[in-house]
């Protein structure tokens, strides 16, 4: 049989998204997106999520109301096949839903899977993420390319970096790079990849006036890091309203010896 292309797939591959297991990627993506919708992360069909299970990549479609998504709406492709293809804009999908278009986030999700071996990547349009990039914009050229914050307990929710063990500590500085937005989402790919190369320990990239991409080794880590990051973004916005600095110099407190 000739392989399907341009987002079309053989009907027989519907088995790839059929499972009674709630932890199956095709079931998990809709349930996660429904939760994210309640948080305002994927409003108006924006944002999305993708899960990698070995070589199979499951992706939420474009244009679907995320709180209403079903397993039958999910795209599936082979990660190895994408790595071998020279045409990034004409992807071959193992399975495609009949009524939707492939997500323009796809190449950005794939960057997290190929460059970081991530198991899950989440893209949100969180207004806290957007506000942080706008605040950084007011700092002037050269000071608007990174979000930095330290001495906040929630920073412990992030790993130390790619292929490093352990998590960041309370006194560590969390650094999230910021890239400029483009008219078409897929055109962000090279800038996201450049940020990943420049910041090898980051688990997220902010997109100015747009949102954020967050990834993790698995669904649990991607989700909790996304939650922690949104908490920190909201905190940072409210700190700025109170003229409180994001970076502080605090002496570590050591326990008294008994």
From Swiss-Prot:
Positions of the UniProt region annotated as Disordered: 1-21
Gene3D superfamilies (UniProt xref): Class II aldolase/adducin N-terminal domain (3.40.225.10)
Compositionally biased tracts (Polar residues): 1-20
Subcellular location(s) per record: Cytoplasm
Record: residues binding substrate: 105
Record pathway: Amino-acid biosynthesis; L-methionine biosynthesis via salvage pathway; L-methionine from S-methyl-5-thio-alpha-D-ribose 1-phosphate: step 2/6
GO cellular component annotations of the record: cytoplasm
GO terms under biological process: L-methionine salvage from methylthioadenosine
Keyword Cytoplasm: yes
Names of the cofactor(s): Zn(2+)
SMART domains cross-referenced by the UniProt entry: Aldolase_II
Cofactor note: Binds 1 zinc ion per subunit.
Enzyme Commission number(s) of this protein: 4.2.1.109
Binding-site residues, Zn(2+): 123, 125, 210
Reaction equations catalysed: 5-(methylsulfanyl)-D-ribulose 1-phosphate = 5-methylsulfanyl-2,3-dioxopentyl phosphate + H2O
Secretion signal, residue range per the UniProt entry: none
Keyword 4Fe-4S belongs to the record: no
Gene Ontology molecular-function annotations: methylthioribulose 1-phosphate dehydratase activity; zinc ion binding
Keyword terms, alphabetized: Amino-acid biosynthesis, Cytoplasm, Lyase, Metal-binding, Methionine biosynthesis, Zinc
Enzyme active site: 153
PANTHER family per record: METHYLTHIORIBULOSE-1-PHOSPHATE DEHYDRATASE
Biological role stated in the UniProt entry: Catalyzes the dehydration of methylthioribulose-1-phosphate (MTRu-1-P) into 2,3-diketo-5-methylthiopentyl-1-phosphate (DK-MTP-1-P).
Family: Belongs to the aldolase class II family. MtnB subfamily.
Protein name in UniProt: Methylthioribulose-1-phosphate dehydratase
Species of the source: Chaetomium globosum (strain ATCC 6205 / CBS 148.51 / DSM 1962 / NBRC 6347 / NRRL 1970)
Taxonomic lineage from the root: Eukaryota, Fungi, Dikarya, Ascomycota, Pezizomycotina
Encoding gene, per UniProt annotation: MDE1
């Amino acid at each position: 049989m000739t392989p399907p292309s341009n987002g079309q797939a053989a009907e027989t591959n519907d088995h790839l998204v059929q499972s009674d297991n709630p932890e199956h990627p095709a079931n998990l993506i809709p349930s996660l997106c429904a939760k994210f919708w309640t948080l305002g992360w994927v409003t108006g069909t924006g944002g999305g999520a993708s899960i990698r299970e070995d070589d199979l990549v499951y992706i939420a479609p474009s244009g679907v109301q995320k709180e209403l998504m079903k397993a039958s709406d999910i795209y599936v492709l082979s990660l190895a096949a994408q790595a071998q293809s020279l045409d990034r804009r004409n992807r071959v999908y193992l399975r495609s839903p009949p009524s939707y278009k492939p997500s323009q986030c796809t190449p950005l999700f794939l960057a997290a899977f190929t460059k970081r071996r991530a198991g899950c990547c989440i893209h949100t349009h969180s207004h806290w993420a957007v506000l942080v990039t706008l605040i950084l914009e007011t700092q002037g050229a050269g000071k608007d390319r990174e979000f930095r914050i330290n001495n906040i307990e929630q920073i412990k929710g992030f790993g130390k970096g790619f292929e490093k063990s352990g998590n960041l500590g309370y006194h560590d500085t969390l650094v999230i790079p910021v890239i400029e937005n483009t008219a078409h989402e897929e055109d962000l790919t090279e800038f996201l990849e450049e940020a990943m190369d420049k910041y090898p320990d980051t688990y997220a990239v902010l997109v100015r006036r747009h949102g954020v991409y967050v990834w993790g080794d698995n669904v649990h880590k991607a989700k909790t890091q996304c939650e922690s990051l949104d908490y920190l973004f909201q905190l940072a916005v409210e700190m700025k309203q109170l003229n409180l600095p994001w970076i502080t110099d605090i002496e570590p407190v050591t326990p008294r010896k008994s």
